[in-house]
Amino acid sequence: MNLAAYFPVLLFLVVGTGLGVALVSIGKILGPNKPDTEKNAPYECGFEAFEDARMKFDVRYYLVAILFIIFDLETAFLFPWGVALRDIGWPGFLAMMIFLLEFLLGFAYIWKKGGLDWE
């Protein structure tokens, strides 16, 4: 394996990270720093805040977010599979059908248990 081919990637990462750190540091050093109570107070359209911004969320929002991530990952697997389907042939097709069947069974299980009900 030729590691010299990865040198541009390493250089890109080092230069990008160094530039980011340098710009943030220069901004912190040269930028004005005069905090007072008015600047640090929360601002909501010219009015005092009506309620605390840190309120509790219903756990169902997190459930929906987790389900979205899971099914989003499923679609992330579907695209490269569709592109490479001609090369991988029937074994790849059957493997993806088993994968999709597992997701379908998981979705049916969540639905049956009431995980998608919002009541």
UniProtKB/Swiss-Prot annotation:
It catalyses: a quinone + NADH + 5 H(+)(in) = a quinol + NAD(+) + 4 H(+)(out). GO terms for cellular component: NADH dehydrogenase complex; plasma membrane. Keywords: Cell inner membrane, Cell membrane, Membrane, NAD, Quinone, Translocase, Transmembrane, Transmembrane helix, Transport, Ubiquinone. It is a multi-pass membrane protein. GO terms for molecular function: NADH dehydrogenase (ubiquinone) activity; NADH:ubiquinone reductase (non-electrogenic) activity; quinone binding. The chain crosses the membrane at residues 7-27, 63-83, 88-108. Its EC number is 7.1.1.-. It comes from the Bacteria. It is found in: Cell inner membrane. NDH-1 shuttles electrons from NADH, via FMN and iron-sulfur (Fe-S) centers, to quinones in the respiratory chain. The immediate electron acceptor for the enzyme in this species is believed to be ubiquinone. Couples the redox reaction to proton translocation (for every two electrons transferred, four hydrogen ions are translocated across the cytoplasmic membrane), and thus conserves the redox energy in a proton gradient. NDH-1 is composed of 14 different subunits. Subunits NuoA, H, J, K, L, M, N constitute the membrane sector of the complex. Belongs to the complex I subunit 3 family. PANTHER family: NADH-UBIQUINONE OXIDOREDUCTASE CHAIN 3. This is NADH-quinone oxidoreductase subunit A. The lineage of its organism: Bacteria, Pseudomonadati, Pseudomonadota, Betaproteobacteria, Burkholderiales. The gene is nuoA.
